Regions:
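Intrinsically disordered, low-complexity linker/terminal regions across diverse proteins
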Residues: 1-78, 82-180
Length: 180
């Protein structure tokens, strides 16, 4: 296993090095991805949301999924979260074509950065354990994505009759739970 992993790394490095100085091929599949992986991501260099096929099964998605679970999983946890990365601390620096180019009006960008700074300061005060605290600037992009994804899903929920918020939040919590 280790040898195969090392050879894959060498191949990827050689491929990426060969592409230096060339015009980016926006149709080229990112070579670091595995189609069986359970993941989704926003790629700021081509302004795309990518959902790997491994996540398109239970518990993330199944055909008779109640709308509350669907909104919690695909709405908040996956799609809403990933779309918002286009507008987080990193994504905000890239334009429509994926070029590193600040496209925001100066006043909007300053306001955005002021809000991010306020969030970072709040997060910096959270004790993890003993004398270890969260470093807000290390997690702000993911926090923005989580909060925005949740807001998007809740906005959709407002339009649903008899939406069960308890089911929604329980499923959302399960999507975020981990054992360590």
């Amino acid at each position: 296993y280790y040898e195969a992993l090392a050879e894959t790394g060498k191949y990827n490095t050689k491929l990426e090095t060969s592409l230096l100085g060339t015009v980016p091929d926006r149709e080229m599949w990112a070579n670091s991805l595995c189609v069986l992986e359970c993941n989704a991501f926003y790629n700021n260099t081509d302004n795309s949301i990518n959902m790997i096929v491994g996540m398109m099964g239970s518990p993330f998605y199944y055909s008779d999924m109640p709308v509350e679970e669907l909104y919690a999983s695909l709405g908040a946890f996956w799609i809403g979260h990933e779309i918002s990365h286009a507008f987080d601390s990193n994504g905000a620096q890239y334009d429509l074509e994926g070029n590193l180019n600040n496209w925001w009006p100066e006043e909007d960008y300053a306001g955005f950065n002021a809000r991010v700074k306020k969030m970072d300061e709040y997060l910096d005060g959270i004790l993890i354990m003993d004398d270890y605290y969260v470093n807000g600037s290390n997690v702000d992009s993911e926090m923005i994505a989580d909060m925005t994804g949740l807001q998007c899903a809740l906005k959709m929920a407002e339009k649903e009759e008899n939406f069960d918020y308890a089911v929604f939040f329980e499923y959302y919590a399960r999507m975020n739970a981990s054992v360590s």
